[in-house]
C-alpha cells in the first residue's frame, strides 16, 4: 500500500458522511414496510390518539433517509405511548423537495396532526418551518435537518441533530486534540447546504485550533461518480487525513477511490447496498449514535425485529424526536384533545425545561430550538463501531 508523505490518507467522517462529524446526519439500507404514499402507524390510530406527523423522501434517490426517519417515528410512537396518552403517526413523502414538503405538511394538517417530527432533509425543513407559525400554529422538531436556518426566528421549531456550525466546530476541536500532527484535506459537496455549512465552520475552527488544512476539494451531485482527481491533488498537497462532511452514497465512492489509489480507507456507510465494508476499516466517525453500543441494544433489537434492518442515526434521531415530544407533552400537561396551536405553544415552552435521556445522548434545548448534546468518536473495526 503506497503512502502519502510517509502516512496513509485516512478518511474521518461524520454521521452522514465520510470523515468527521454528524448529518447523519445516516441511513442507507432500504427499510421494509413503508408505503411510498405514507400511512398511519403507531400504537393507536384515530381520534383517541395524539397525532404525530412525519415528512421525508420515501421515494427517489434519498428514500433511504426518509424511510429510516419514518420507521424511527413509528417505533417511537409505539414505545412512548401510554394508556393515558396514546400516540399515532402518519408519514408523507416529499422526495426531499421543499414545495412537496409543504404540500405534505398541509396533508398532515388535514389528517389532524398535532405535532410534526420532521421533515428529514434540510431544504424541506426550512420550507416547512416557515409554515409552522401560520394558523394553525404547529410544533415541529426535525430529526435530521442541521442548518441554523431551520430554527432561526421560529419559536415552535426544534432540532434533534447538531447544527452545522456545531458539527464542524466539534469535529475540528476533537481532531486537533487527537490528530494534531496530521495534514488535512477538506472534502465537501459545494452544492449542498449541509456539507458546505459544516465545511465552513470546520475551516474556521481548524484555524483557531491550529489544525493544518493543506488542501480543499469540492464536488457536486452531478459529478459524484469518481473523486480520483480530487484525491490526486490531495496527495500532491501532502494530505494525510480527509475530513469529509458528506452523505453516505458519495462517501462510498470516496472510500472506493481511496482504496484504489493505495490509501487506507461512515455511520450508515456499512449499510450501503453492494458496498465492500472492508474498505471502511479504520474509518473514524464522530456520531452520537452507534448500533453496536450496548446501551442501545433494546432499541436496535426491537428495530431489527420489526423492520429486518439495523437502525442508523436517522432512525435513532427520529426515535429521540418522538421521545422529546412525549416528555414535553407530560411536562405541558397536554392530552389527545390538544389543538395544534395550543400544542405548539405549550410544547415549545416545555422543551426548554425537559432533559431527554435518548439514544443519541442526553438532550436539552436552548431558546433557539437547538439541541445540546455531546458527540462520540468511533473507529470502524472488523465491521463494527468501536469507541475511539
Regions inferred by a protein language model and the residue ranges of each:
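Extracytoplasmic "Venus flytrap"
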Residues: 53-72, 76, 80, 92-99, ...
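Bacterial lipoprotein signal-peptidase II cleavage site
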Residues: 34-45
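An alpha-beta-alpha
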Residues: 58, 157-218, 241
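Segments of small-molecule ligand-sensing domains
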Residues: 311-315, 327-384
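Beta-alpha junction/loop-to-helix N-cap segments that form part of ligand/metal-binding clefts
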Residues: 40, 67-69, 79-151, 219-221
